[in-house]
Amino acid sequence: MVTVVDKVTSMRVRHPEKAHRPDTSIQKKPDWIRVKAPTSQVYKETHGIVRANKLVTVCEEAGCPNVGECWSQRHASFMILGEICTRACAFCNVATGIPLAVDDDEPERVADAVAQMGLKHVVITSVDRDDLADGGAQHFAKVIYAIRRKSLGTTIEVLTPDFRHKDHALEIVVAAKPDVFNHNLETVPSKYLKVRPGARYFHSIRLLQRVKEIDPMIFTKSGIMVGFGEERNEILQLMDDLRSADVDFMTIGQYLQPTRKHHPVIRFLPPDEFESFAKIGKAKGFLHMASSPLTRSSHHAGDDFEILKKARAQKFS
């Protein structure tokens, strides 16, 4: 894969398609999007644990707006399999290029960090690793097993890539029995060619459906960003597609443009529209909906897991 260094917006490795993309204007964020800069001592301690264990977090790599809040509460989402992705999605700030070899010691370091932070719930995600025969599935499983050995009471949520063209990869991850299996659709199907060109919408739907077929007790979850120019009825249809795959939990958040080289924000949706989506989603049968401008897949993941457990218990009581 040919890559270039984007010296204009950052010193990140970029796919040529992204680095050479014409600049687009970045809209001023509305007041409801703004967050406070992180300053707490707990934030610094969390940062120190991550660095000491030589780990990568999606909180930093993706430029999550909630990093200050989450790290101040000792919440962190670990990104395994390196910090270089094999794909170049138009919304994502993670570096693209040729990844390094898999770090065999990483599962133990992640488990050590989880134990040191005393996490009750942890989220494990990764870059896309199309270069690996199993897409990184076995490494996901090793991380899950390592955490179980050192933090038996910690619940584990995985946020996986689509494992496209990786036969039996999904089965490897599901066999490790994460408590929550998350795979994000990211956007409506009409936007895939521009926003998520390396993925296929209905492959992702089928992936989520297959998880439930293999192990019905694992909670399934998916999320999208809005603001790419999608229509409201497209979002409602996407909800129906997720429910047809028996997905339990959906997240909806506002897309925020990382740099001028990324897909522009077409529209900032006001908070009341997000509240409307949450009500509609509950009516469609999701056990839980998290929908707000600053909602992200891993935001409040531990609290959401407790809500999911209670909702399932009530449903079958």
UniProtKB/Swiss-Prot annotation:
It catalyses: [[Fe-S] cluster scaffold protein carrying a second [4Fe-4S](2+) cluster] + N(6)-octanoyl-L-lysyl-[protein] + 2 oxidized [2Fe-2S]-[ferredoxin] + 2 S-adenosyl-L-methionine + 4 H(+) = [[Fe-S] cluster scaffold protein] + N(6)-[(R)-dihydrolipoyl]-L-lysyl-[protein] + 4 Fe(3+) + 2 hydrogen sulfide + 2 5'-deoxyadenosine + 2 L-methionine + 2 reduced [2Fe-2S]-[ferredoxin]. PANTHER family: LIPOYL SYNTHASE, LIPOYL SYNTHASE, MITOCHONDRIAL. It is found in: Cytoplasm. Residues 71-287 form the Radical SAM core domain. The gene is lipA. Coiled coil: none annotated. GO terms for molecular function: 4 iron, 4 sulfur cluster binding; lipoate synthase activity; metal ion binding. SUPFAM superfamilies: Radical SAM enzymes. PROSITE patterns: RADICAL_SAM. It comes from the Bacteria. This is Lipoyl synthase. [4Fe-4S] cluster 2 binds at residues 85, 89, 92. The keyword ATP-binding does not apply. It comes from Bartonella bacilliformis (strain ATCC 35685 / KC583 / Herrer 020/F12,63). Its EC number is 2.8.1.8. Keywords: 4Fe-4S, Cytoplasm, Iron, Iron-sulfur, Metal-binding, S-adenosyl-L-methionine, Transferase. Transmembrane segments: none annotated. Disulfide bonds: none annotated. Binds 2 [4Fe-4S] clusters per subunit. One cluster is coordinated with 3 cysteines and an exchangeable S-adenosyl-L-methionine. [4Fe-4S] cluster 1 binds at residues 59, 64, 70, 298. Its cofactor is [4Fe-4S] cluster. Belongs to the radical SAM superfamily. Lipoyl synthase family. Pathway: Protein modification; protein lipoylation via endogenous pathway; protein N(6)-(lipoyl)lysine from octanoyl-[acyl-carrier-protein]: step 2/2. GO terms for cellular component: cytoplasm.
